[in-house]
Every structure is written in structure tokens, then in C-alpha cells.
């Protein structure tokens, strides 16, 4: 969820199983050409399904379940994205959320909606019995969740 230039998508594609696919979502239409260029050059274009639009509208329409979900998008919607995907993640599946420490802003009184949402997300996943969670304090913070 959140493609930007597609670097993370390509890295994830390198670890796919033989018949695996990746669905990637971004709402920035201006980045589609850049993403396509990199996906073609990488050799993984045929296993990557690009979706353009708001993730909250696209996720319900993607078929199947997920082994891994990487969230690196609009911080305000991290709690919503978790709610939309959690029941579709396979047992033992992994959810990775980037930027969860938000330059240390989550440790202070929140002054913006993104920080409030990340604080809410961090509490939500910490207290959710469906997942085991750990925050890795590298760079801007990375949450790893494993579905029980």
C-alpha cells in the first residue's frame, strides 16, 4: 500500500514464489510511468498488478488473501488499512508498516493528524490479539506483525 517509484515492490518481487503476484496501490497518477519503467526494467512487470486510486477503495476489490502486506502510504489511514487487510492476511502472514516512529513525533503530544493516526495505529496493533507485533527502531521505525 503505497508504491512511490516502485523500489520496494521490486525488492518484494524478488522474493516471490513461482506463481506469486504482487498487488501495489498508489494514488499518484504522475508516478505510473516511472513505476512501469522500473517494473519493466526489473523483469517483474508480469507479476506486478498496479492499482491507481485510493487504497481504501481498492483493497476491498482485490481478490484473494495476502501472505505479506507492506504499508507505506498516507499515515492518517494506517488504522483503516489494518482493518481492511487483517482478516485477509493468511495465518502466519506478515504485515509491515513503515514510518511508525515518525521522526520521534509519536513520543510527544501530537500536533497533526498523521502523528495522531500513527499513535492510534501503534496502540491498535499492540493490543490486537490477532497479531504479534514488534517495532524495530531503525530509521523512522518499522512495525512487523505476524498474524496468529
Spans of features found by a protein language model:
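S-adenosylmethionine/decaboxylated-SAM
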Residues: 1-148
Amino acid at each position: 500500500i503505497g508504491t512511490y517509484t516502485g523500489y520496494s515492490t521490486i525488492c518484494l518481487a524478488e522474493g516471490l514464489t513461482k506463481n506469486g503476484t504482487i498487488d501495489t496501490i498508489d494514488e499518484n497518477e504522475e508516478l505510473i510511468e516511472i513505476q512501469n519503467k522500473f517494473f519493466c526494467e526489473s523483469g517483474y512487470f508480469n507479476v506486478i498488478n498496479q492499482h491507481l486510486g485510493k487504497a481504501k477503495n481498492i483493497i476491498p476489490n482485490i481478490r484473494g488473501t495476502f501472505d505479506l502486506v507492506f504499508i507505506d502510504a498516507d499515515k492518517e489511514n494506517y488504522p483503516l488499512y489494518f482493518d481492511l487487510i487483517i482478516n485477509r492476511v493468511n495465518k502466519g502472514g506478515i504485515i509491515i508498516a513503515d514510518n511508525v516512529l515518525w521522526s520521534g513525533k509519536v513520543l510527544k503530544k501530537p500536533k497533526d493528524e498523521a502523528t495522531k493516526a500513527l499513535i492510534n495505529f501503534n496502540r491498535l496493533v499492540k493490543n490486537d490479539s490477532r497479531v504479534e507485533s514488534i517495532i524495530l527502531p531503525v530509521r523512522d521505525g518499522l512495525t512487523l506483525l505476524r498474524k496468529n
